[in-house]
Amino acid sequence: MSNSVDTQSLMLQMRSLAAEAASQSQSVQKVEKGAQSAENFSDLLSQSVNAVATEQNKSSAMKTAFEKGEDVDLTEVMVQAQKASLSFQAMTQVRNKLVEAYKDIKNMPI
């Protein structure tokens, strides 16, 4: 009878060790995925800033072309200017939210 209790105890210990090992491997995978998502976030942020810069440059070029009298429609110039303005405003709001989140994290009690 004591033999069966020892076997059950041994099985419980083995299961708990297996569960612990599985959770540790999952946490390692989460850390690796977190590092990859950090790289992806920085890439995404960089691409977004570049896209806003492209919109601004395109708007500026269209305005200059219109002012020089080249064959550019005024409505296209205005639409592009609004696209550039909206994308810049959105980027500014994202920056503000990131700064706010950073300040919140910085001021958290340890």
From Swiss-Prot:
UniProt cross-references to InterPro entries, sorted A to Z: FliE
Top-level division of the source organism's lineage: Bacteria
Keywords carried by this UniProt record: Bacterial flagellum
Location within or outside the cell: Bacterial flagellum basal body
GO terms of biological process kind: bacterial-type flagellum-dependent cell motility
GO molecular function: cytoskeletal motor activity; structural molecule activity
GO cellular-component term (any): bacterial-type flagellum basal body
Sequence similarity: Belongs to the FliE family.
HAMAP family: FliE
The protein's name: Flagellar hook-basal body complex protein FliE
Organism: Hydrogenovibrio crunogenus (strain DSM 25203 / XCL-2) (Thiomicrospira crunogena)
Phylogenetic lineage: Bacteria, Pseudomonadati, Pseudomonadota, Gammaproteobacteria, Thiotrichales
